[in-house]
Amino acid sequence: ALAVGDRLGGHIVAGHVDCLATVESITRIGDSLVCRLGFPEAFGPEVVPKGSVALDGISLTINECGKNFLTVNIIPDTQERTTMRLWKPGVSVNMETDIIGKYVRRQLPGSRDGANGDEKGAAASSAGITRDFLLGNGFF
């Protein structure tokens, strides 16, 4: 387990699958592979360029993305040491979006707030994130 004070050299992967993504294409560029994957549009807001995603538990950086797709670059070491070497177009893979992005999204107006009856989160969502909200919650 990661201890408080330990160096975090990547992104936090909880191991919870958010959805299935489908490998749409794999293109070789030099020694690397560029993989394009499609996923349900509902997860689009949690995927950002240069952000992180876990695909089949492999922590990767997102190159580009849209409402229902993303691309990642797979270096030779990752190709050899992970199950991604089994990927081919049409294969489904487990996708986990970044946990920090989920927390940020939850605070935005129109998000999926209140799922756990969290009044504080719902209040942030209905009013948006304001200076008063941040002051009242210890951010200043």
Q: Which residues does each predicted region cover?
A:
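Structural preference for solvent-exposed beta-strand-turn elements
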Residues: 1-140
